[in-house]
């Protein structure tokens, strides 16, 4: 099986897995499948190996650990090293526009600034000194956020839209999610930084993908490879087709082809997640609220949820105040005075 077919299967498998996770993430089916697979594996693997894996997974996903942050920087460094070493040099020889070739470095500079801000900024840690103030920022919807609920770990009243992060072991104001890639929670005070970081990361991956593909296409055009012929396995001359051309380019520029494949997949994944993050920002939701929304409504209204004759109920998002105000709140966190203006 040639390289093109294998690479196509790899891309298709990866994208299908991501789509399946996105589709079933709000249901119990995926969890049941994962737990069932884990139980099957547990029966055939030694106890010592299971304990080692559990310890490793706990360290990586249930404690603040810089492993994913280091992996993020390593992958980003490798991508830019390959871009600088080969793609940039070859594109200069083919007389590409210099501003276009420098654009990935501009995006990298901006990305690193907002990456640092996302990592280092307090996401909105709730403490005894600020809990009374934060309790006044958002109204309680009495569905996902009951008025008198307390955090059993921090022993503090829980402001609306807050959540206790088990990884960081703290309650976070307007909690969105814990991001292992920045080793920090995403909350009220760093969501804006996170969005710009995600936007520039997506743009840099897409720009490198476009420039790498443009280099290969111009190389094919300059070399007139489509007009060449080759000998097949039966000794007959065949016109160069797309499959043969890709394999030829892979043999001639293997690192660039791998780079192109990686950044294409990365661009698609990041673009999908960026669209989701922008949707949440435009509707003034957090990832935590989006994930919990349907389940919280079903718990609060069991008769409505399970009665076949009842009309379907929709959980109203009381925190959305229009597109412009919602986006403004992402970059300028809401305050008690902000809430009063909206009344």
Swiss-Prot record:
What is the role of this chain?
A: Palmitoyltransferase that could catalyze the addition of palmitate onto protein substrates including the D(2) dopamine receptor DRD2, GSK3B or MAVS. Mediates GSK3B palmitoylation to prevent its AKT1-mediated phosphorylation leading to activation of the STAT3 signaling pathway. Also catalyzes MAVS palmitoylation which promotes its stabilization and activation by inhibiting 'Lys-48'- but facilitating 'Lys-63'-linked ubiquitination.
Give the residues annotated as active site: 179
Q: Name one GO cellular component term.
A: plasma membrane
Per its record, the protein catalyses:
L-cysteinyl-[protein] + hexadecanoyl-CoA = S-hexadecanoyl-L-cysteinyl-[protein] + CoA
Q: Mind telling me which residue stretches traverse the membrane in this protein?
A: 3-23, 68-88, 96-116, 194-214, 256-276
Return the InterPro entries for the record.
Palmitoyltrfase_DHHC, PFA4/ZDH16/20/ERF2-like
Entry protein name: Palmitoyltransferase ZDHHC4
């Amino acid at each position: 099986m040639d390289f093109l077919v294998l690479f196509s299967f790899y891309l298709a498998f990866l994208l299908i897995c991501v789509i399946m996770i996105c589709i079933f993430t709000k249901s119990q089916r995926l969890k049941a499948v994962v737990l069932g697979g884990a139980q099957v594996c547990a029966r055939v693997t030694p106890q010592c190996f299971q304990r080692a894996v559990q310890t490793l997974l706990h360290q990586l996903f249930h404690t603040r650990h810089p492993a994913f942050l280091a992996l993020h920087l390593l992958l980003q460094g490798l991508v830019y090293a390959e871009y600088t070493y080969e793609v940039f040099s070859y594109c200069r020889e083919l007389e590409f526009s210099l501003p276009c070739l420098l654009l990935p470095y501009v995006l990298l500079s901006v990305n690193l600034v907002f990456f640092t801000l996302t990592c280092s900024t307090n996401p909105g840690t709730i403490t005894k000194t600020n809990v009374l103030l934060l309790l006044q920022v958002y109204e309680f919807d009495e569905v996902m956020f009951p008025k008198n609920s307390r955090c059993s770990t921090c022993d503090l009243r829980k402001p609306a839209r807050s959540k206790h992060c088990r990884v960081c072991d703290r309650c976070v104001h307007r909690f969105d999610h814990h991001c292992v890639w920045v080793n920090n929670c995403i909350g009220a005070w760093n969501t804006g930084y996170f969005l710009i970081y995600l936007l520039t990361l997506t743009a840099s991956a897409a720009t490198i993908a476009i420039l790498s593909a443009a280099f290969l296409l111009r190389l094919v055009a300059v070399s007139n490879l489509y007009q060449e012929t080759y000998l097949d396995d039966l000794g007959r001359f065949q016109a160069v087709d797309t499959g043969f051309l890709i394999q030829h380019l892979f043999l001639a520029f293997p690192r660039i082809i791998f780079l192109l494949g990686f950044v294409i997949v990365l661009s698609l994944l990041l673009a999908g997640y960026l669209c989701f993050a922008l949707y949440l920002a435009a509707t003034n939701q957090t990832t935590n609220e989006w994930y919990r929304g349907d389940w919280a409504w079903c718990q609060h209204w069991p008769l409505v949820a399970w009665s076949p004759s009842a009309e379907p109920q929709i959980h109203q998002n009381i925190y959305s105040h229009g597109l412009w105000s919602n986006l403004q709140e992402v970059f300028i966190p809401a305050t008690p005075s902000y809430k009063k203006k909206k009344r």
